[in-house]
């Protein structure tokens, strides 16, 4: 009968198989059971690979949910490739039997020592030799048990890892069927669950389990600080919290007393609780400092000395300051860090702070997020991670700046205002979206579109500073985006060119700020959105104040311009003592060389008979030699007669508006016009023209018609209505009618006499 021994393990059990005989092994391998084509991963494959190791004490078992690293398994034995140095141990001679017994004795001795000192670990060399013997030795003599045999699954060199795993699973199933009648414990305890298997000692006896203790879930376990190799640490800023979560899942669950007694199975790595564990901070470039806050390390490299926050991957030049536990919830992100600091509501706490702040427990939601980030890494973040590393490598080369210098350089102008922001990108807008009543809705939609989809920062297109922290400065009527590291200006926008600005209206969007302006290169309207560390209402208020100031300055400048213009006007209205009124240069003046017969007063202002009688009287009273030569200048408004000998002597000056009648006499060489001098006095001036008076008469006629047109245009519309007819004896009526009649008769006379004068 099989002897049932108690096992002092409350966490889990592990099945360890020993070879019964060579024939049994062959029969097991040739059994009709077909290996499965799929891998059943309900239990950790590392536990199944270690199923051939026999343990006499259940304290050496691991917790059911604590999975050991791949490095804890001898890879050559798992793949069926045994070490050549131990290949002679595979024989069936007596030497092999002796080695098996020696190995069993060593295991029992180790178990007794483990009971005395549960926290003592075996040396790696002894464990490696012991494991090699147990994995490679096969007992040729069968051992009888109480009605049931334990069939081993011996890996062969010619089989692959998958074949070996399939045989191992088949053996486990057959063992479960054979052990059914002889188990002395309950069925629910005998069946191995995920990560569990019944404990079997070397002679085939089954060890019962103690009542299961409450298993610690990942949510209830206390999280320790992340430790990894130096290579992992170098890559840590790139992967961020996901790498920490992966290492946390493998290594950093709170170790139990049973787990602390496990020894390593390989020389490549040590147990998580082993004193031989490789410390990441053993590297000379990483130095521990007890004065630093939890999760911070000091790093020395070619760039200088800086500080690295392990959980978030944040690096900074300044020494971090310890923050009390009650202030963790209100911590602000550091603007001097290379990577973007999260907002206070989304800020993650360091791993070492979870146990203190949460009472030794992890929130289930946080655990699920960490688990999802580890199992399903997001490949779309590779581009952003690459940009982050490039940005970090550039900024770490710069010398650190002091806080005093930063504040002085940013706030050099006392009226300048600076805000910590992070760009979320821009969205193109149409002109009609900025119409009154639509602009606020359009800007809020842009804030929604960019703020909701940028939670994970999927891309860096259109994002100033590749999504990093920066300063938004309002100074000298300019909105500037300044790099917090080297104080370089990433973008500048004149405030007067900003069309619209606004703040997010949705719940939780009070920190989102947006403004709309036209791009100076593409001339398209862009709505730029930023995430602020403080409520964005402060930026909007500052912009409003600056715009009000600009409008007031413009209003004052306009008032000054109007006052100066009025002063100039008042100065121009002062009447000078002497003024010259030049003749308009646009006035057309025609000059004719004629002879002036003289002037004769007449009784009537119009009439050809009056004109002809005046011409005959002047021609008969003087000879042609006595007629002086003069220049007649015919302009639009004036007819002037100037002496040819003395150009400054004006003989006659007649305004066209006072010319009452004109015409050509019976002789085509004679030309005369009647001028109204006022007080019912009229004068008739007579001229002798060569070769005829046609050109002179046409010039004077054109001047009269132009003057008439100007009078019609200058008259207001209300005065264009024909006035009532004047009295019959009115001089005005008679003068107007006679002028028209005289002009028409002159035209008829010229038409009749022109062919005669031109005949030779």
From Swiss-Prot:
Q: What Gene3D superfamilies does the entry give?
A: 2.20.70.10, Pleckstrin-homology domain (PH domain)/Phosphotyrosine-binding domain (PTB)
Q: Where is the PID domain?
A: 413-580, 586-738
* Localization per record: Endoplasmic reticulum; Golgi apparatus; Early endosome
Q: Which domain of life does the UniProt lineage start with?
A: Eukaryota
Q: In which tissues is it expressed?
A: Expressed in the brain, retinal lens and muscle cells (at protein level).
What segments bear the compositional bias annotation Polar residues?
A: 212-230, 261-275
Q: Where is this region: Disordered?
A: 177-295, 324-351
List of residues that carry Phosphoserine: 123, 160, 334, 409, 412
Primary residence: endoplasmic reticulum
The WW domain extends over: 290-322
Disruption of the gene: reported phenotype: Knockout mice develop cataracts from 16 months of age with defects such as ulcer-like anomalies in the cornea, and opacity in the lens cortex or wider lens. Decreased muscle strength, however clasping ability is unaffected. Impaired spatial memory retrieval and learning. Reduced branching of hippocampal neurites and increased fragmentation of neuromuscular junctions. APBB1 and APBB2 double knockout mice show progressive retinal lens disruption from 1 month of age, morphologically lenses show massive vacuolization, lens capsule rupture and disruption of the lens fiber cells organization.
One annotated GO molecular function is: amyloid-beta binding
A single Gene Ontology CC annotation of this entry is: Golgi apparatus
**Subunit description:** Interacts (via C-terminus) with APP (via C-terminus). Interacts with APLP2 (via cytoplasmic domain).
Q: What does this protein do?
A: Plays a role in the maintenance of lens transparency, and may also play a role in muscle cell strength. Involved in hippocampal neurite branching and neuromuscular junction formation, as a result plays a role in spatial memory functioning. Activates transcription of APP.
Name of the protein this chain belongs to = Amyloid beta precursor protein binding family B member 2
Q: Which organism is it from?
A: Mus musculus
Q: Which gene is the coding source of this polypeptide chain?
A: Apbb2
């Amino acid at each position: 009968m099989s002897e049932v021994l108690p096992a002092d393990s409350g966490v889990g059990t592990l099945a360890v198989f020993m070879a019964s005989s060579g024939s049994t092994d062959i029969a097991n391998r040739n059994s009709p059971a077909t290996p499965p084509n799929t891998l059943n991963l309900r239990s950790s494959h590392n536990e199944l690979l270690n199923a051939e190791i026999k343990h006499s004490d259940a304290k050496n078992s691991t917790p059911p949910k604590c999975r050991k690293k791949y490095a804890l398994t001898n890879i050559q034995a798992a793949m069926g490739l045994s070490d050549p140095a131990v290949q002679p141990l595979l024989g069936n001679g007596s030497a092999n039997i002796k080695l098996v017994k020696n190995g069993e004795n060593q295991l029992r001795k180790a178990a007794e020592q483990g009971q005395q000192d549960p926290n003592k670990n075996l040396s790696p060399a002894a464990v490696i030799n012991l494991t090699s013997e147990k994995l490679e030795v096969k007992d040729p003599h069968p051992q009888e048990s109480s009605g049931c045999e334990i069939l081993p699954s011996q890996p062969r060199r010619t089989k692959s890892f998958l074949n070996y795993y399939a045989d191992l699973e088949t053996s486990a199933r057959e063992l479960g069927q054979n052990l059914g009648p002889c188990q002395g414990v309950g069925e629910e305890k005998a069946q191995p669950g995920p990560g569990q298997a019944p404990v079997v000692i070397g002679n085939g006896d089954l060890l019962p389990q103690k009542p299961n203790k409450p298993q610690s879930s990942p949510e209830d376990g206390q999280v320790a600080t992340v430790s990894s190799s130096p290579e992992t640490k170098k890559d840590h800023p790139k992967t961020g919290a996901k790498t920490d979560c992966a290492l946390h899942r493998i290594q950093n669950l709170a170790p139990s007393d049973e787990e602390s007694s496990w020894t390593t199975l390989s020389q490549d790595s040590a147990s998580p609780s082993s004193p031989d564990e490789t410390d990441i901070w053993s590297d000379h470039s990483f130095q521990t400092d007890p004065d630093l806050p939890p999760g911070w390390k000091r790093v020395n490299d070619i760039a200088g000395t800086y500080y690295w926050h392990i959980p978030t991957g944040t690096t900074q030049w300044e020494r971090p300051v310890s923050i009390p536990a009650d202030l963790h919830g209100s911590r602000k992100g550091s603007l001097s860090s290379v990577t973007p600091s999260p907002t206070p509501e989304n800020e993650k706490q360091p791993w070492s702070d979870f146990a203190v702040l949460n009472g030794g427990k992890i929130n289930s939601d946080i655990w699920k997020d960490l688990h999802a980030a580890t199992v399903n890494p997001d490949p779309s973040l590779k581009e952003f991670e690459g940009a982050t590393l490039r940005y970090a490598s550039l900024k770490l080369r710069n010398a650190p700046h002091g806080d005093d210098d930063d504040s002085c350089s940013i706030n050099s102008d006392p009226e300048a205002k600076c805000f910590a922001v992070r760009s979320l990108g821009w969205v193109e807008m149409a002109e009609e979206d900025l119409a009154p009543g639509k602009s606020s809705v359009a800007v809020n939609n842009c804030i929604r579109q960019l703020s909701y989809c940028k939670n994970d920062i999927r891309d860096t297109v259109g994002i100033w500073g590749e999504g990093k922290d920066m300063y938004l400065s309002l100074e000298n009527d300019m909105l500037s985006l300044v790099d917090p590291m080297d104080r370089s200006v990433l973008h500048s926008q004149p405030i007067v060119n900003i069309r619209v600005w606004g703040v997010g209206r949705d719940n939780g969007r009070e920190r989102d700020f947006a403004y709309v302006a036209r791009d100076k290169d593409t001339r398209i309207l862009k709505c730029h959105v930023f995430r602020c560390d403080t409520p964005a209402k402060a930026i909007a208020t500052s912009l409003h104040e600056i715009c009000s100031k600009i409008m007031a300055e413009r209003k004052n400048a306009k008032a000054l311009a109007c006052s100066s213009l009025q002063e100039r006007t008042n100065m121009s209205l002062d009447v000078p003592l002497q003024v010259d009124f030049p003749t308009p240069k646009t006035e057309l003046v025609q000059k004719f060389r004629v002879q002036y017969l003289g002037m004769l007063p007449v009784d009537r202002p119009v009439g050809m008979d009056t004109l002809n009688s005046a011409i005959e009287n002047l021609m008969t009273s003087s000879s042609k030699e006595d007629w002086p030569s003069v220049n007649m200048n015919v302009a639009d408004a004036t007819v002037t007669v100037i002496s040819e000998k003395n150009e400054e002597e004006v003989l006659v000056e007649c305004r066209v508006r006072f010319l009452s009648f004109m015409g050509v006499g019976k002789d085509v060489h004679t030309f005369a016009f009647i001028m109204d001098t006022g007080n019912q006095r009229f004068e008739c001036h007579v001229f002798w023209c060569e070769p005829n008076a046609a050109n002179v008469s046409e010039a004077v006629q054109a001047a009269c018609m132009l003057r008439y047109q100007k009078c019609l245009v200058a008259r207001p519309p209300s005065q264009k209505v024909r006035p009532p007819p004047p009295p019959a004896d009115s001089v005005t009526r008679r003068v107007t009618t006679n002028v028209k009649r005289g002009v028409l008769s002159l035209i008829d006379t010229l038409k009749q006499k022109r062919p005669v004068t031109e005949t030779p």
